[in-house]
Design a protein with these regions (language model features):
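Short, recurring structural edge motifs at helix starts
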Residues: 14-20, 31-33, 77
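Conserved small/polar residues in nucleotide/adenosyl-binding loops
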Residues: 134-136
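Alpha-helical transition-metal enzyme core signature, strongest for iron centers
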Residues: 21-29, 48-62, 80-87, 110-124
Length: 136
Protein backbone atom coordinates (compact mmCIF):
# COMPACT_ATOMS: atom_id res chain seq x y z
CA UNK A 1 0.00 0.00 0.00
CA UNK A 2 1.08 3.51 -0.70
CA UNK A 3 1.57 5.75 2.29
CA UNK A 4 -1.44 7.85 3.25
CA UNK A 5 -2.02 10.99 5.24
CA UNK A 6 -3.00 8.67 8.09
CA UNK A 7 0.41 6.94 8.28
CA UNK A 8 1.45 6.19 11.83
CA UNK A 9 -1.78 7.43 13.41
CA UNK A 10 -4.48 5.76 15.44
CA UNK A 11 -6.83 6.65 12.60
CA UNK A 12 -4.76 4.46 10.28
CA UNK A 13 -5.07 1.59 12.77
CA UNK A 14 -8.81 2.22 12.98
CA UNK A 15 -9.14 2.16 9.19
CA UNK A 16 -7.21 -1.12 9.06
CA UNK A 17 -9.41 -2.59 11.80
CA UNK A 18 -12.55 -1.39 10.01
CA UNK A 19 -11.37 -2.99 6.75
CA UNK A 20 -10.54 -6.26 8.51
CA UNK A 21 -13.82 -6.32 10.40
CA UNK A 22 -15.95 -5.62 7.35
CA UNK A 23 -14.01 -8.21 5.32
CA UNK A 24 -14.46 -10.83 8.02
CA UNK A 25 -18.17 -10.05 8.31
CA UNK A 26 -18.60 -10.39 4.55
CA UNK A 27 -17.05 -13.84 4.56
CA UNK A 28 -19.07 -15.00 7.56
CA UNK A 29 -22.33 -13.83 6.04
CA UNK A 30 -21.50 -15.59 2.78
CA UNK A 31 -20.91 -18.84 4.70
CA UNK A 32 -24.11 -18.28 6.68
CA UNK A 33 -26.02 -17.77 3.43
CA UNK A 34 -24.75 -21.08 2.07
CA UNK A 35 -25.85 -22.88 5.21
CA UNK A 36 -29.28 -21.22 5.20
CA UNK A 37 -29.74 -22.14 1.53
CA UNK A 38 -28.78 -25.78 2.20
CA UNK A 39 -31.36 -25.84 4.98
CA UNK A 40 -34.01 -24.49 2.60
CA UNK A 41 -34.19 -20.91 3.90
CA UNK A 42 -33.94 -19.00 0.63
CA UNK A 43 -35.13 -15.67 2.05
CA UNK A 44 -32.65 -15.81 4.93
CA UNK A 45 -29.87 -16.79 2.52
CA UNK A 46 -30.74 -13.82 0.31
CA UNK A 47 -30.62 -11.46 3.29
CA UNK A 48 -27.21 -12.78 4.33
CA UNK A 49 -25.93 -12.33 0.77
CA UNK A 50 -27.33 -8.80 0.51
CA UNK A 51 -25.70 -7.88 3.81
CA UNK A 52 -22.43 -9.49 2.70
CA UNK A 53 -22.48 -7.28 -0.39
CA UNK A 54 -22.99 -4.22 1.83
CA UNK A 55 -20.05 -5.27 4.00
CA UNK A 56 -17.93 -5.66 0.85
CA UNK A 57 -18.67 -2.06 -0.10
CA UNK A 58 -17.88 -0.86 3.42
CA UNK A 59 -14.56 -2.71 3.31
CA UNK A 60 -13.76 -1.19 -0.09
CA UNK A 61 -14.45 2.28 1.27
CA UNK A 62 -11.86 1.84 4.05
CA UNK A 63 -9.37 0.01 1.81
CA UNK A 64 -9.48 2.82 -0.74
CA UNK A 65 -8.94 5.34 2.05
CA UNK A 66 -5.77 3.41 2.92
CA UNK A 67 -4.64 3.59 -0.74
CA UNK A 68 -4.91 -0.18 -0.86
CA UNK A 69 -5.95 -0.32 -4.51
CA UNK A 70 -3.21 0.57 -6.96
CA UNK A 71 -2.76 -0.12 -10.63
CA UNK A 72 -2.71 -3.73 -11.78
CA UNK A 73 1.06 -4.12 -11.43
CA UNK A 74 0.96 -2.70 -7.90
CA UNK A 75 -1.96 -4.95 -7.04
CA UNK A 76 -0.17 -8.05 -8.36
CA UNK A 77 2.92 -7.19 -6.32
CA UNK A 78 0.85 -6.54 -3.21
CA UNK A 79 -0.99 -9.83 -3.68
CA UNK A 80 2.27 -11.74 -4.22
CA UNK A 81 3.80 -10.21 -1.10
CA UNK A 82 0.72 -11.07 0.93
CA UNK A 83 0.74 -14.66 -0.26
CA UNK A 84 4.47 -14.89 0.46
CA UNK A 85 3.91 -13.78 4.05
CA UNK A 86 1.13 -16.30 4.46
CA UNK A 87 3.11 -19.32 3.30
CA UNK A 88 6.57 -18.42 4.60
CA UNK A 89 5.67 -16.92 7.96
CA UNK A 90 2.05 -17.06 9.03
CA UNK A 91 1.06 -20.64 8.23
CA UNK A 92 4.52 -21.98 9.00
CA UNK A 93 4.31 -20.46 12.47
CA UNK A 94 0.73 -21.65 12.94
CA UNK A 95 1.75 -25.21 11.98
CA UNK A 96 4.69 -25.22 14.39
CA UNK A 97 2.50 -23.99 17.23
CA UNK A 98 -0.23 -26.52 16.45
CA UNK A 99 2.37 -29.33 16.42
CA UNK A 100 3.85 -28.14 19.72
CA UNK A 101 0.38 -28.11 21.27
CA UNK A 102 -0.44 -31.59 19.95
CA UNK A 103 -2.82 -30.56 17.16
CA UNK A 104 -0.98 -32.48 14.44
CA UNK A 105 -3.90 -32.82 12.02
CA UNK A 106 -4.50 -29.07 12.16
CA UNK A 107 -0.77 -28.46 11.69
CA UNK A 108 -0.93 -30.55 8.53
CA UNK A 109 -3.89 -28.51 7.26
CA UNK A 110 -1.93 -25.31 7.88
CA UNK A 111 0.94 -26.77 5.84
CA UNK A 112 -1.39 -27.78 3.01
CA UNK A 113 -2.87 -24.29 2.85
CA UNK A 114 0.66 -22.84 2.94
CA UNK A 115 1.50 -24.87 -0.17
CA UNK A 116 -1.56 -23.42 -1.91
CA UNK A 117 -0.56 -19.90 -0.86
CA UNK A 118 2.90 -20.52 -2.34
CA UNK A 119 1.24 -21.44 -5.63
CA UNK A 120 -0.83 -18.26 -5.46
CA UNK A 121 2.33 -16.20 -5.00
CA UNK A 122 3.96 -17.90 -7.97
CA UNK A 123 0.93 -17.16 -10.17
CA UNK A 124 0.85 -13.49 -9.18
CA UNK A 125 4.59 -13.11 -9.78
CA UNK A 126 4.30 -14.81 -13.18
CA UNK A 127 1.47 -12.46 -14.14
CA UNK A 128 3.47 -9.48 -12.92
CA UNK A 129 6.40 -10.63 -15.06
CA UNK A 130 4.13 -11.04 -18.08
CA UNK A 131 2.68 -7.59 -17.48
CA UNK A 132 6.17 -6.09 -17.39
CA UNK A 133 6.90 -7.64 -20.79
CA UNK A 134 3.86 -5.90 -22.25
CA UNK A 135 5.07 -2.51 -21.00
CA UNK A 136 8.62 -2.79 -22.34
Amino acid sequence: MKETKYAGTQTEKNLMAAFAGESEARNKYTYFASKAKKEGYEQIAALFLKTAENEKEHAKLWFKELNGIGDTAENLLSAAEGENYEWTDMYDGFAKTADEEGFHELAQRFRLVAAIEKHHEERYRALLHNLSLIHI
